[in-house]
Amino acid sequence: MNSEHPMTDRVVYRSLMADNLRWDALQLRDGDIIISAPSKSGLTWTQRLVSLLVFDGPDLPGPLSTVSPWLDQTIRPIEEVVATLDAQQHRRFIKTHTPLDGLVLDDRVSYICVGRDPRDAAVSMLYQSANMNEDRMRILHEAVVPFHERIAPPPFAELGHARSPTEEFRDWMEGPNQPPPGIGFTHLKGIGTLANILHQLGTVWVRRHLPNVALFHYADYQADLAGELLRLARVLGIAATRDRARDLAQYATLDAMRSRASEIAPNTTDGIWHSDERFFRRGGSGDWQQFFTEAEHLRYYHRINQLAPPDLLAWAHEGRRGYDPAN
């Protein structure tokens, strides 16, 4: 147990998908790597990059989501997840979508935090929701979570109501944090919210100068994957030459990951996807433009300036080209 870091020092985040109280069951080790990002912001991509460095090659000892589990996800018994991690002899790397203020902050651990243009993350989440078997998710959730802590089904009015992308994006843009930090289990609606994304990135931004916190961005991966892999190696203290980084990066392209989707996509052993390959849909940028009218685009810029400071917004939308977090 993490008795040195009581939960009172952290914000509670609990939903159908995740419960950050589960972190208290894991004893962290010197050298552990925790990868944190909002949904559909490049977390799986970063896991793959870290795996290439930890194992010095493309081969994995098991499915990536078993080797590098989403520890707070509520569909696997925490005892099983912790037992798997405790048995690992290699350097451990663990996935989370919990904001940094909800995690155990340990000087011995490296925190790799990833961002993406929130609009692109929302589009990707829209397609992922269509690929997810929600009934299977609920069955797995109810098999693990005690009855008194389970999420109630969605309100009856929401059942059977097919929402248009326009409706989804309007709610995404205007909605608050879901769930608000610090409250109990909450039913999440739709594809999350813009406020969720910028809140999570904000918890990283104010801690970005800590020596064991490093920021990476989806746009920077797209621009120079080998260069970002080399930078990641340096952050983690793993020896790698530029030529070796270039060789390894070929195994982390979208096509390469899609070709091994049963190994690389998350939760492939849990049966929650209609298609593992569709998890790696396109990986592009700018698809949000088909869902935004000029008025919605203007509203978006008004909204983001309510939610975050200019330097964070520049990085969140463009990576280091927009603003270097080292500043």
Curated annotation (Swiss-Prot):
Domain of life of the source: Bacteria
Please tell me which top-level EC class this enzyme sits in: transferase
Please state the Enzyme Commission number of this protein: 2.8.2.-
Single GO MF descriptor: sulfotransferase activity
Active-site residues?
A: 97
Q: Does the keyword Transferase apply?
A: yes
Q: Which Gene3D superfamilies match?
A: P-loop containing nucleotide triphosphate hydrolases (3.40.50.300)
Question: Do you know which InterPro entries this protein is assigned to?
Answer: P-loop_NTPase (IPR027417), Sulfotransferase_dom (IPR000863)
State the UniProt keywords alphabetically.
Transferase
User: Which residues does the record give as 3'-phosphoadenylyl sulfate binding sites?
Assistant: 40-45, 116-124
UniProt keyword Zinc-finger, yes or no: no
Q: Which family does it belong to?
A: Belongs to the sulfotransferase 1 family.
Q: What does this protein do?
A: Involved in the synthesis of cell wall sulfolipids.
Name of the protein described by the UniProt record: Glycolipid sulfotransferase BCG_1434
- Can you name the source organism? Mycobacterium bovis (strain BCG / Pasteur 1173P2)
